[in-house]
């Protein structure tokens, strides 16, 4: 029986609010119980926390959300997770933040500046143009 959903993610605790909003449907589907969001400051910590949770919380649905650091070549699990001793059987519990996802956050600079702070615009200009993506509506 599943007692809880635990999402271990690569990133700062400041991301929790955004993830909570993004994952609101999971809370609804899980009878009002939000998934537990566990921040790992880096990839290694997120993976270590995930592996530990598999042992300590065996009745929970433990999920790992980490950055792909590049395009998905179809071998991300093999090259990133297997060397960290994450079993192939857990492949369906690992999810990737890909470059495209990161570009969504930078697509509307005006909205980011309005929500966060005015001087953010200067910091965003420091991002190389090759990393910027045109704004599109899908």
Label each region the model flagged.
Residues 6, 61-63, 104:
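Residues embedded in well-ordered beta-strands
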Residues 1-59:
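RecA-like P-loop NTPase motor core
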Residues 11, 68, 109:
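Residues immediately flanking
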Residues 8, 64-67, 97:
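Conserved beta-strand segments of the P-loop GTPase G domain that flank and frequently precede/overlap
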Residues 14, 69-73:
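Short acidic, S/G/P-rich loop/turn micro-motifs used as interaction or catalytic elements
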Residues 74-138:
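Activity-critical C-terminal alpha-helical subdomain
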Residues 52, 60-64, 72-84:
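A glycine-rich, hydrophobic loop/mini-helix early in the fold
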